[in-house]
Amino acid sequence: MQPSPPPTELVPSERAVVLLSCALSALGSGLLVATHALWPDLRSRARRLLLFLSLADLLSAASYFYGVLQNFAGPSWDCVLQGALSTFANTSSFFWTVAIALYLYLSIVRAARGPRTDRLLWAFHVVSWGVPLVITVAAVALKKIGYDASDVSVGWCWIDLEAKDHVLWMLLTGKLWEMLAYVLLPLLYLLVRKHINRAHTALSEYRPILSQEHRLLRHSSMADKKLVLIPLIFIGLRVWSTVRFVLTLCGSPAVQTPVLVVLHGIGNTFQGGANCIMFVLCTRAVRTRLFSLCCCCCSSQPPTKSPAGTPKAPAPSKPGESQESQGTPGELPST
């Protein structure tokens, strides 16, 4: 039996980059949860699914942060605990990501409405929380989670490479669902985009007002960009983990390449940050309210005093000015 290769060593700069990625992902996931709590009128079914994805990403970022901070050098109880939490959260994140794409496909292309979508949401909960939980509990009970020498991770613990069937458990605890998502996400979003483009083409023949048509095209263009970017961002983040997984199976020393290690660390930990960029910072309805909230917090300072010592009175507002400055929630586009 050949001796196992030395573990992948992480230099402080690599750990710092991955820790920063974990922190930004946790911040982004927390911001998504906060926007859901602050504005009830924005709680559509799709954004409700995004809330559960954000919770999974938040737990994933926290568990990865602990793993990278500890940089485990061998098996221990907290290595198993961290590996179990990250396995559950990471697998759940895969399921919720596909669930959002499937929901958009069924609601837009198949026009699913009413009780049917309610049953669908319950099914998403059962699958997206239940399946990862069963897999994780089984992996812990069978002692499959443990130290992996950072060959298929970046400092954190996952599947014990000493287990005889470690490849099977790597597939069950993440890689199988990851590779299925590579196929399902582009396929579902492509079908949704084709349906939307077909509908816009049909509607354009009956829109005589050019300004409305221009606004429709502008909003649909932003939606089309998102439908393309969502699967591309997911694949762009996760592919480095898959590459190192394949290199580990092949026994290639390239698995320890520093650039590949850093990309793997960022890709596995930054999903929450990427979702925040897409669905908060690049969604005008949420971005406008968030910036307004920040401006209100910054402007809520005590009134300045005039040289005479009396506080300056605020300038009287013009009639109708306050109504013009406040847009109704329904007027804010979701793109």
From Swiss-Prot:
The chain crosses the membrane at residues 16-36, 49-69, 88-108, 120-140, 167-187, 227-247, 259-279. GO terms for biological process: adenylate cyclase-activating G protein-coupled receptor signaling pathway; cell surface receptor signaling pathway; circadian behavior; phospholipase C-activating G protein-coupled receptor signaling pathway; radial glial cell differentiation. Disulfide bonds: none annotated. InterPro entries: GCR1-cAMP_receptor (IPR022343), GPCR_2-like_7TM (IPR017981), GPCR_2_secretin-like (IPR000832), GPCR_Rhodpsn_7TM (IPR017452). PROSITE patterns: G_PROTEIN_RECEP_F2_4 (PS50261). It holds the Pfam family 7tm_2. The keyword Cell membrane applies. Its main location: membrane. GO terms for molecular function: G protein-coupled receptor activity. It is a multi-pass membrane protein. Keywords: Cell membrane, Cell projection, Developmental protein, Differentiation, G-protein coupled receptor, Membrane, Receptor, Transducer, Transmembrane, Transmembrane helix. Residues 1-15, 70-87, 141-166, 248-258 are extracellular. SUPFAM superfamilies: Family A G protein-coupled receptor-like. GO terms for cellular component: ciliary membrane; plasma membrane. Residues 300-335 are annotated as: Disordered. Residues 37-48, 109-119, 188-226, 280-335 are cytoplasmic. It is found in: Cell projection, Cilium membrane. Residues 320-335 have a biased composition (Polar residues). Orphan receptor that promotes neuronal differentiation of radial glial progenitors (RGPs). The activity of this receptor is mediated by a G(q)-protein that activates a phosphatidylinositol-calcium second messenger. Belongs to the G-protein coupled receptor 2 family. This is G-protein coupled receptor 157. It comes from Homo sapiens (Human).
